[in-house]
Regions:
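Active-site-adjacent segment of SDR/Rossmann-fold oxidoreductases
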Residues: 130, 146, 167-177
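Substrate-binding pocket helix/loop in short-chain dehydrogenase/reductase
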Residues: 94-96, 103-105
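The beta1-alpha1 cofactor-binding region of Rossmann-like NAD(H)/NADP(H)-dependent oxidoreductases
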Residues: 57-69, 101
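Residue(s) in the substrate-gating loop at a strand-loop-helix junction
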Residues: 141
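Conserved glycine-rich cofactor-binding loop
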Residues: 11-13
Length: 249
């Protein structure tokens, strides 16, 4: 029987690559994201596996959208085995004291509240289905460990994702729900294109940074969910080998 997955932010980048890897591994995947055209494009890219993809336009900053997403998955496929909480975003790099309050709220809504709400809805399904349980994987980012300059909103939410991961792991145990976190550094996506031109470093200089093939991340997601539910990759870091992470800050 095919596993059922939800991938948020599936219209581009890491979400698209991960959704395609899951589809190619035999999953049925609900593609969640704000742009239906992008989700449809992801589904088309799956080739022969396109029938196993379901595009569900979803804004993770809107609770009603999230509730509707998981209700549709349950109504369509009857169960849920995997959620990849991937959708999110950042803010323009500005000094902490100049960050607009509204920008702070928007980043928190996308990067923390959205994954929390997705986790809530997923757990409601996973705890009551038969066979019971499932897996939730959170996209934490390298910024869950070390900040970039002028990134207080993004860095704070990614550190908070680690708390969400740990709490979900603890609270999900009794229901056979495993939760892990993948911390990604400099995968080739539209979001990291700016790194090829140079990004601000902690010492005030600007430097281009190496990136890695996003397929490495997608393959890691498939591996994390290949384990039985009595085993869990609690935390995994997948990063460009030569990126300035170790020693950053």
């Amino acid at each position: 029987m095919a596993k059922i997955a939800v991938v948020t932010g599936a219209g581009s980048g890491i979400g698209r690559a991960s959704a395609l890897a899951l589809l190619n591994s035999g999953y049925k995947v609900a593609l969640a994201g704000r742009r239906k055209d992008a989700l449809d494009e992801t589904a088309k890219m799956a080739g022969n596996n396109t029938p196993n993809a379901m595009a569900v336009p979803t804004d993770v900053t809107k609770r009603d959208d999230i509730v509707a997403l998981f209700a549709k998955v349950k109504a369509t496929w009857g169960r849920l085995d995997l959620v990849f909480n991937n959708a999110g975003g950042g803010a323009p790099p500005v000094p902490l004291e100049e960050l607009p309050y509204e920008t702070w709220l928007s980043v928190v809504a996308a990067n923390l509240t959205g994954p929390f709400l997705c986790t809530q809805e997923a757990m409601k399904i996973m705890k009551d289905q038969s066979p019971r349980g499932g897996r939730i994987i959170n996209n934490g980012s390298i910024s869950a460990h070390a900040p970039r300059p002028f990134s207080v909103a993004y860095t704070s939410t990614k550190h908070a994702i680690t708390g969400l991961t740990k709490s979900t792991s603890l609270d999900g145990r009794q229901y056979d729900i495993a939760c892990g976190q993948i911390d990604i550094g400099n995968a080739v996506t539209p979001m990291t294109e700016r790194m090829t031109k140079g990004v601000l470093q902690p010492n005030g200089t600007t430097m281009a940074e190496p990136r890695m093939d996003v397929k490495a991340v997608a393959d890691a997601i498939v591996y994390m969910d290949s384990l039985p539910l009595d085993a869990n990759v609690q935390f995994m870091t997948v990063m460009a080998t030569k990126m300035p992470f170790v020693g950053r800050g």
